[in-house]
Design a protein with these regions (language model features):
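PDZ/PDZ-like peptide-tail recognition elements
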Residues: 108-109, 115, 121-124, 200
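Flexible, glycine-/basic-rich loop-and-beta segments that form/coincide
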Residues: 2-75, 79-85
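Sequence-specific dsDNA recognition surfaces
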Residues: 37, 92-111, 126-154
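A short beta-sheet element
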Residues: 124, 143-205
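Non-catalytic DNA-recognition/assembly elements of restriction-modification systems
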Residues: 50-109, 232-252
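AMP-binding (ANL) adenylation modules
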Residues: 1-4, 112-114
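A short glycine-rich beta-alpha junction/loop motif
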Residues: 12, 76, 115, 178-186, ...
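Short glycine/serine/proline-enriched coil/turn segments at secondary-structure junctions
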Residues: 2-5, 131-132, 149, 177-179
Length: 252
């Protein structure tokens, strides 16, 4: 909308005595230009009309519902809140452990990084592309004992904490290998007697899963997912045999 910036823009229309708020998502309503997106007259008319009635990209939200959602003005938080999955469970019921990665400063990382190949590596957000972790992760000289709890276990689910779309991967860690995750990542150890990590990844990367993550996202400039919201996310959990079949097809 504005030249020279990619920061999302929100507009608030204020009035008195309301018991509800109509939220409108116009993020996909524009004409793409070479250097800058623009609103056509038709786009503007569509947005104005959306402020008057519920539709595909607008919804009237009660003050009570706003309060329950921490007064978030992100429409995706209120879409399909009544979605029901067959065999749906809370995410925390299949999690053995969840932690954020290590919050290391740039100077700390400079001291830790090794020019030589070692059995210790560092995983950053940029090392995850298209759901796959880069095999050529930076090597580390050593991992301080205090940081050991931030190391990734084999088959851990890795989820980016910030940014959209969120990045998701399953880590493969060899017996003698140590991988330290950074603070922008959630490291999720699943109970594999209940859930196949690749099945959970497949769900979170599906249209339904992406929508579910959007509903628990807060912030517009830098979208992020809070750990409590993540733990209470509802995921469909069929029998393990069916999960394994889906995971095999997905990783194909």
């Amino acid at each position: 909308m504005f030249s020279g910036t990619n920061i999302p823009t929100s507009m608030i229309v204020l009035s008195r005595g309301n018991q509800s708020v109509r939220l409108v998502d116009a993020s996909e309503t524009y004409q793409q230009g070479r250097r800058q997106n623009e609103f056509s007259e038709e786009d503007i008319e569509k947005i104005v009309s959306a402020t008057q009635a519920d539709g595909e990209n607008s919804k009237l939200i009660s003050l009570e519902e706003l309060r329950k959602n921490e007064y978030s003005l992100n429409l995706s938080r209120y879409r399909d809140n009544d979605v029901q999955y067959e065999n749906g469970v809370t995410f925390k019921s299949i999690i053995k452990n969840i932690t954020r990665g290590a919050a290391c400063t740039a100077s700390q990382m400079d001291e830790m990084v090794s020019e030589k190949e070692t059995n210790m590596q560092f995983l950053m957000l940029s090392n995850i592309q298209n759901g796959i972790i880069d095999e050529k992760l930076p090597y580390l000289k050593e991992i301080d004992e205090k940081l050991a709890k931030y190391c990734v276990k084999n088959n851990s689910l890795i989820l980016s904490k910030n940014g959209s779309p969120f990045k998701i991967a399953v880590a493969t860690v060899q017996d003698e290998q140590k991988i330290l995750a950074n603070g922008n990542l959630y490291v999720i150890e699943l109970d594999e007697t209940k859930a196949n990590p690749y099945y959970i990844k497949a769900f979170l990367e599906s249209e339904q899963g992406i929508a579910a993550l959007k509903r628990i996202t807060v912030g517009t400039t830098i979208p992020s997912i809070g750990v409590d919201k993540l733990k209470n996310l509802i995921v469909p959990l069929p029998a393990l045999e069916e999960q394994n079949q889906i995971a095999t097809k997905y990783t194909g």
